[in-house]
A protein has these predicted regions:
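Electropositive polyanion-binding surfaces
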Residues: 1-451, 455, 459-460, 470-477, ...
Length: 484
């Protein structure tokens, strides 16, 4: 019987991850305790109607939100768990987190960057618990501009732990959708969510005017019985609530980067460089009647994507996958104040960091430490060389984590497809190199190797393929080309 949990654990080890907490870190964890809430200068915001929105099964809650309408716009507050209070720089817990740099979500088992006693308890913004947080405050004007912003430490309390699917159904007023339990009879919380949704929409509209790219993406999660049998592959797509949180977090990340720049501290930026394969993106657009300029231009690409989403929605997920592949991966880079650095091409922002998930990503924990240094006007706790090395480490381990997650999902998909050998599918070429090509079918949304790939194929080409073999233990899914 296929044991996906064993496969996931071995994949973690093969990629150099720590899967068991080292003894010294365990000793520190055993002595971890609730923080004292009497520190001078820390604001007490526990009376506010904070709420969180996350996945149904999320237990590591990194951020909560609050909104207040005022003249000139909506003031948004993002409270991010103060993980640094528990995980001090250069401690054994910090060393373990720095080694892995990220939580890994395989769909059958989560390998948290920080032990669960911290990430799902003491440093998680769980409902009803008083917690320390680093708050990003920003005023969103009616045209979507962030006209004021600051950051500070505070005591907060999550009043309502909500989920993406339930909030999205409620916001969209879907027929038959049940009002989330926390919203029943709670008019103030309903007003809160609608204010946050409206502010997020303004932010999103302004970013898309600047060239932020519209995509339709799908996350595949295996459904496994208690005995480890794969019974289904569920596709989860972004909805209104995920976009709400995403838009607020993007704005908070921009504020974080600007805050450190303003205070003269170096930072770790999240960048997606100008795409090297713009020529192929242009060629794809031309096949669909689009006309992109010779030089990379996010505004033109976004206009084309929106037009395709309206006129050809059935194939927009395919197009999204192809363009995402051609844009290239994101990476972390150290930035010194005053120096130019690449921006994030896909989000159409120049100054961007990761800062809102310190329980899950080490880059965010580093950002939190830098912000706290800026708040008390001290020097950076890291040298430029140290930050540069840590940025490289975070990029490398993120790539490793993606490969672990992808392998486990491919093993699950191979198990599901075992009875479909010989079946034919419509597919799109999702990757290509000197060794061959990869294709992705739509139902289920699974990627596999294309045997004997023709040299004329490139990312985005539609092909007709036959499933010829699978190996669930190794995650191999092989297709043969029928026509292109």
């Amino acid at each position: 019987m296929l044991n996906l949990r064993a496969i996931a654990r071995q994949a973690m080890l093969d990629r150099g991850f720590i899967v068991s907490l080292p003894e010294a870190a365990q000793h520190e964890l055993n002595n971890a305790a609730e923080p004292r809430f009497d520190s001078a200068g820390i604001r007490d915001l526990t009376s506010w109607l904070w709420s969180s929105i996350d996945n149904d099964d999320s237990r590591d809650l990194d951020q909560i939100e609050f909104a207040a309408k005022e003249t000139g716009g909506t003031r948004i507050y993002i409270g991010v768990a103060d993980v640094d209070w528990f995980v001090r720089a250069n401690s054994a817990l910090d060393d373990a987190a720095q080694h892995n740099t990220t939580s890994v979500y395989t769909g059958v088992q989560t390998f948290p960057m920080l032990p669960e006693r911290l990430s799902t308890d003491l440093s998680s913004l769980n409902e009803g618990e008083k917690r320390l947080a680093v708050v990003t405050e920003m005023l969103i004007a009616d045209d979507g501009r962030v006209t004021e912003s600051t950051m500070y430490s505070a005591i907060v309390q999550n009043k309502a732990q909500l989920t993406y699917d339930a909030v999205a159904a409620w916001l969209d007023e879907e027929p038959g959708a049940k009002t989330p339990q926390r919203l029943l009879g709670n008019g103030d919380l309903q007003v809160q969510l609608k204010m946050q949704d409206a502010a997020a929409h303004l932010l999103r509209e302004r970013r898309h005017e600047a060239g932020a790219l519209t995509f339709q993406t799908t996350e595949l999660r295996p459904v496994v019985t208690p005995d480890g049998t794969v019974v289904d592959l569920q596709a989860h797509v972004h909805n209104r609530a995920t976009r709400l949180i995403e838009d607020l977090m993007i704005a908070a990340n921009e504020v974080n980067a600007g805050f450190l720049e303003q205070h003269g501290l170096p930072s770790i930026r999240r960048v997606v460089k100008t795409p090297a394969r713009w020529d192929r993106i242009r060629a794809l657009a031309a096949l669909m009647g689009g006309n992109l300029p010779e030089e990379p231009d996010a505004v033109s690409l976004e206009a084309f994507l929106q037009q395709q989403q309206r006129t050809n929605p059935a194939h927009f997920a395919e197009l999204s996958l192809s363009v995402i592949k051609l844009l290239g991966r994101g990476e972390y880079m150290m930035k010194v104040p005053g120096e130019e650095a690449p921006g994030h091409f896909g989000l159409a922002v120049q100054n961007y960091s990761h800062s809102t998930a310190p329980n899950r990503r080490y880059a965010d924990l580093l950002a939190q430490r830098l912000v706290k240094a800026a708040q008390v006007r001290t020097n950076s706790p890291y040298s430029v060389d140290e930050l540069s090395a840590l940025a490289t480490r975070c990029t490398q381990k993120e790539d490793d984590a993606n490969k672990v997650e992808r392998l486990v999902k491919k093993c699950a998909a191979a198990a599901m497809l075992r009875s479909h050998i010989g079946q034919q599918y419509e597919a799109v070429v999702s990757g290509i190199n000197a060794d061959g090509a990869w294709v992705r079918i739509t139902h289920p949304p699974v990627e596999g190797t294309l045997e004997g790939a023709a040299k004329h194929l490139d990312v985005g080409h539609r092909v007709h393929v036959r499933l010829v073999s699978v190996n669930p233990e190794r995650g191999f899914i092989d297709f043969a080309l029928i026509s292109s």
